[in-house]
């Protein structure tokens, strides 16, 4: 279903970009959001620069865009309903920046979470680890590897950007995550690099909650295992510390 949605999305973007490009050639610029307001048909019909035969085919292309948009909205609604009724997706969506589309994509691509022995394994699986460039005695870190599922990676980075904007406006309720973001901001990290770093952290969080089988618990987040109550220690795997798992107590719904 995720593959079908991605195909609809590609076809919609391609059709809309083609429509926009043809209209611009005839001196009829189309701004963002015009498609949703149903003004394109009016703009094309009232234009005196475009010949009638061109108008007819532009309206056909416009109708194709609308049909693709309806299909995309329909399948997105289905995925949201599926995520709302799925236990694993519910746990994944407890992470800030992850909504139903991202959650269902991650569930489909992760498979068995036990195959990721370390947090870095799942980050590398989605291509969010930096490239290592070694020459002689020097070793440098480059951009991310961009391996794995491209759609899931782009959704995670998009979600990370939303979380960063919420944190900048003071709307993010997670104190541990706010502290982490503030620490990275003090390093004057570029926006794109910060989004990738936060997306990687979100993946580590997803791995932790799926292995433990629980959602976030803000009360015990950021605390060493030895200092937890005895009834809470069983939720921690081995000798790992929950300090590796920031524990937001809210979720942000985005695609």
Label the predicted regions.
Residues 22, 71, 75-78, 109, ...:
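Generic, well-ordered alpha-helical scaffold segments in large soluble proteins
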Residues 58-62, 82-85, 96, 142-146, ...:
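Conserved phosphate/pyrophosphate-binding and hydrolysis machinery centered on Walker-type P-loop NTPases
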Residues 91-94, 100, 106-187, 191:
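Phosphate-backbone recognition surface of nucleic-acid-processing proteins
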Residues 1-91, 220-223:
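Glycine-rich, often acidic, oxyanion-interacting loops/wings at catalytic, nucleic-acid
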Residues 11-18, 102, 118, 152, ...:
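Residue-level detector of well-ordered alpha-helical segments, enriched
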Residues 15-16, 73-76, 112-115, 162-171, ...:
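Short helix-capping/linker segments at secondary-structure and domain boundaries
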Residues 137, 141, 177-255:
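Low-complexity, acidic/Ser/Thr- and charged residue-rich accessory regions of DNA metabolism proteins
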């Amino acid at each position: 279903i995720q593959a079908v949605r991605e195909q609809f999305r590609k076809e919609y973007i391609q059709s809309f970009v083609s429509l926009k490009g043809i209209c611009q050639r005839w001196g009829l610029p189309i701004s963002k959001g015009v498609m949703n307001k149903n003004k394109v048909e009016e703009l094309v019909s009232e234009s005196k620069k475009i010949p009638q035969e061109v108008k007819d085919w532009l309206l056909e292309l416009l109708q194709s865009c609308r049909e693709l948009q309806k299909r995309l909205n329909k399948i997105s609604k289905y995925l949201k309903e599926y995520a709302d009724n799925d236990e694993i997706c519910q746990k994944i969506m407890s992470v800030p920046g992850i909504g139903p589309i991202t959650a269902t994509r991650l569930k489909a691509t992760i498979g068995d979470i036990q195959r990721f022995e370390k947090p870095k394994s799942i980050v590398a699986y989605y291509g969010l680890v930096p490239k290592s460039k070694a020459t002689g005695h020097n070793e440098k870190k480059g951009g991310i590897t961009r391996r794995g599922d491209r759609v899931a990676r782009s959704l995670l980075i998009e979600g990370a950007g939303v979380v960063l904007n919420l944190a900048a406006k003071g709307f993010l309720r997670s104190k541990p995550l706010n502290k982490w973001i503030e620490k990275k901001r003090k390093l004057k990290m570029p926006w794109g690099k910060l989004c990738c770093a936060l997306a990687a952290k979100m993946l580590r969080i997803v791995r932790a909650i799926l292995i433990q089988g629980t959602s976030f618990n803000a009360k015990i987040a950021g605390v060493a295992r030895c200092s937890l109550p005895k009834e809470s220690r069983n939720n921690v795997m081995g000798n790992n510390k929950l300090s590796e798992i920031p524990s937001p107590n809210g979720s942000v719904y985005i695609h």
